[in-house]
Structure formats: structure tokens, C-alpha cells
Amino acid sequence: MLLASLIALLAGATGPLGLRTQGTLRELFLDVTAADARPLARPELDLRWSLANDWNEPMQLARHDDRALQYLDEQADSLTASYRAPWPRLPWIWTAVEGRLTEHWGGWSDRPIEAWHRLTGAFNYQREAFPRDQLRLLYADSGGVAFDLRSARLAVGDLVARTQATVLQGAPGAVALRFDLKAPTGLLSRLGGSGGFDLGGGVLGTVLLAPWAALHGLVALSHFGELSAPTRLQPKPWHWSFEGSLALSFGETVVLIEDRCLSPLLPPGWQRLPGGGDDGILSSGLYAGFRVHNQVSAGVRRGRFAVWASEDFTPGPNPHSTIQWIWVSNAPDFVLGLSFTQPL
């Protein structure tokens, strides 16, 4: 019992944040999230709030005779509840059930983001040419309309079940296998979910570098179902993701630095129709939908509470920008979050 309590204490204190990659389109699908590879000693309830500001100006796409329109401008505030517990007779396996409510609205975060851009001299992605704190979400093409929102909506999200089994464990760390499943309980028209089933699997590792440092990793492969709308532009069926998390303990405070990288959401073959020059390309959803997405996060955990912030910076060629070795998708542009975890 003492050993189990110690494992729970260490895993809870130095485990990764378990973040998903937010954003209007990515949130519709399953995201295999990181976790400590060591067993879970007791049930726990995790409650979290997060804010994601998305900004992609109107974009027109073409593939042969097909045409598509995208416009993603919102603040999404999410409340997520997750209950996870070890199996009674197989304590090295745990299962979690996760549900989410999201308010899609104009929010308040546009002005602080623009102020930060002015302060740092960063490119403002043509935000100043559009109304602040507005909601406008459109995904449509020659085949149909997936969503078209002009006013705030509260959306019930898809239900997610996650099961993880520790297969190797020793003094320096552990290795675990994971299987996740998403069921379509949310409505696509309200941006609650994709309207289809998704599944994913992954390998997780945890290494104790020192009594005050832990390193976590995740490699995952997922299969996405199609959007429930008859749009021509559908997600790629297969997706990979990589994630790394470094947890550094300073007394009762844990500082976390994380990086997660996801494959492109949408398939190749579509071209953005010209307009707006280089600034128009950078401000559109081209990179968000058709390129790899890399999210960098920093967080602090103390006791049962954790706070974090995330930005997307993806290394790679970007000839349309003055900084040509990195790109930013702005989907989301910025994320803030707060979580409370209660052992049961």
C-alpha cells in the first residue's frame, strides 16, 4: 500500500500535462494525449478549462472543378471532465472516460493578442482588417456545408475512452501501450465533433532522469472517420503524432516544458486560390490544414492545480515570411489552460 501510494504521488506530480492540440478543426477529431507510462495507483477526477483563440482569414481552395471555403475566427472556451481508474484485478491497466463542453464565441482575447504582436514587433496576420472579438466559422465546398456559424454556440463534445497498459516497469521508468476511441456524441453543425468514429493507439515511455526530473514520450497513430457532412474536402484517414514532456521539480512546484507534433489534417491536392500576396497566405488556414502542426507548451503544477500556455511554432521552409525557417498556423493562435486533479 505504501509503494502504491508513492507511485501515485510521483506519477501525479511529475506526469505530463496531457494536452490536446486545440483549434476549430483539430478539436473535431481524436487526439491521443500523453500520460505517465507508470501504473495509476488510484482513481482520479480531472477537471480542466482551456481557451483557444483561432484566427484564419477567409480562404478559397480548389481541386480540379471542386471549390471550398474556410473562415475560422473564434475564441473557444472548453470545460473537460475526465475520470480514470485502474482495473481492479489488473492494476497495471487503467481506463479513462472523457467528455467536453465548448462555447464557441467571439470572446475577449483578440485585443490582448494584437497588443502582444505590437509590443514584440510580430506580424499581426492582418487581424486589424477584421472585426475584433467576432465569431465567424465556415467550412463548405461543392459537396456541402460542414458548419456555418455566425453567433455563439454551446456544443456538447464527442465522448472519448482511453485505455493504457504498463508493459514494462523498472527503477528508471516504464513503457506503456495505449488505445483510444472517440464516439460521435457531438454535432458537427455546432462544432461538437466530427460526426464519425475515430480510434488511435500509441506507445508511451517515462524515464526518471533524476529525483527531480522526468522525461515522457509518446508516439501514436490514429484513424479518423469522415465528417458527417458530404463535403468533398475530408480529413486524411491516417495520422501520426509525437510528443515529448520534461518535468522539473523545484520543491512542491513542477515546471513542465512540452512539444507535440501532428501530421497534416487535410489531404494534399487542394490549392489555395491566389489573393492577398504573402500576407494573405500567412493569414489563411493553408498551413493549419495542410501542413504539420507543432505545438510548444509551458506549464506549472503545484499540488492539485496546473496552469499552462501553448503556441504553435513549426520548423520548416516558409518562403512567404521574413522568417523563412518556421511557420505559424494560428489554429489556434494561443491557448491558456487550468486544471484541477482530485485523487479519489
Where are the language model's segments positioned?
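Outer-membrane beta-barrel biogenesis signature
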Residues: 6-48
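Surface-exposed strand-loop-strand hairpins of Gram-negative outer-membrane beta-barrel proteins
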Residues: 15-21, 38-39, 48-78, 147, ...
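Hydrophobic, lipid-facing positions within transmembrane beta-strands of outer-membrane proteins
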Residues: 28, 43, 75-81, 157-163, ...
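Transmembrane beta-strands of outer-membrane beta-barrel pores
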Residues: 49-57, 99-105, 158, 167, ...
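Outer-membrane pore/translocation modules
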Residues: 100-238, 286-288
